[in-house]
Swiss-Prot record:
Top EC category: ligase
PROSITE patterns: SAICAR_SYNTHETASE_1
Gene for this chain: purC
Reactions it catalyzes: 5-amino-1-(5-phospho-D-ribosyl)imidazole-4-carboxylate + L-aspartate + ATP = (2S)-2-[5-amino-1-(5-phospho-beta-D-ribosyl)imidazole-4-carboxamido]succinate + ADP + phosphate + 2 H(+)
Pfam families registered for this protein in UniProt: SAICAR_synt
Keywords: ATP-binding, Ligase, Nucleotide-binding, Purine biosynthesis
EC number, as in UniProt: 6.3.2.6
BP term (GO), one: cobalamin biosynthetic process
Entry protein name: Phosphoribosylaminoimidazole-succinocarboxamide synthase
């Protein structure tokens, strides 16, 4: 049975499923630098689909609503059909990545409470940071919606951070995207090593897409993705 392709991004394809659901097919592509560097990492799509499904199920079990419904096949997720908001929301527990370049903050500083940032999804403009005023002016979301999203992000962190610590992993930061259904905000997109920074507790070993960003070979990246999924799912 063939399904109508609705859209295709760097790492996923979206297909129509029924009136209220879509299929998210995870591709084997891996990218960095707003798509400037691209490769095919065999098996990554399956790993990311399974990782996202596992973590969405974890969130759902704790009362956090996501778009996850179930799996269509090993690399394809059945999800609620959302009107997605073109904003990436990042929660940072420990400083790394762009924040240490943008601000006088040192690598490894611990944020208590966590820092939450909003970025416009726009590769050409390199995903500029947004504040409440920008988002209201651009009609992306109201201030009340932004505050609700911040509340959800903190709740997600309260679930994920201790869960990963129980696996001897540190959640440095993570990114989520949100959509609306009947004016309700719901977590959409994915929750994978493409959208989280994970370090091994103690050693500081990188177990996420930062390996690829820093030039590691594809086999090393794949082994990290495999190890991460094995550790969280055991």
């Amino acid at each position: 049975m063939e399904f109508l392709k609705l859209s295709e991004g760097k790492t996923k394809e979206v297909y129509a499923y029924d009136d209220s659901h879509v299929l998210l097919k995870f591709k084997d592509s891996i990218t960095a630098g707003d798509g400037a560097r691209k490769d095919i990492l065999e098996g990554k799509g399956i790993l990311n689909a399974q990782t996202s499904a596992f973590l969405f199920r974890l969130l759902e079990s704790k009362g956090i609503e996501t778009h996850y419904i179930g799996m269509f096949d090993e690399r394809t997720m059945i999800a609620k059909k959302l009107k997605m908001i073109p904003v990436e929301v990042v929660l940072r527990n420990i400083a790394t990545g762009s924040i240490v370049k943008r601000l006088p903050i040192k690598e490894g500083e611990v944020f208590e409470p966590p820092i939450i940032e909003f970025f416009l999804k726009d590769d050409e403009r390199h995903d500029p940071m947004l504040n409440y005023y920008h988002m209201e002016y651009l009609k992306l979301m109201t201030r009340k919606e932004a505050e609700k999203i911040e509340e959800i992000m903190l709740k997600v962190n309260e679930i994920l951070y201790p869960f990963f610590r129980s696996k001897k992993l540190l959640l440095y930061d993570f990114k989520l995207e949100f959509g609306r259904v009947n004016d309700k905000l719901i977590i959409g997109d994915e929750l994978t090593l493409d959208s989280m920074r994970i370090r091994e507790e103690g050693s500081g070993r990188i177990l996420d897409k930062d390996l690829y960003r820093k030039g590691a070979d594809l086999e090393t990246v794949k082994k990290a993705y495999e190890e991460f999924f094995k550790r969280i799912s055991e």
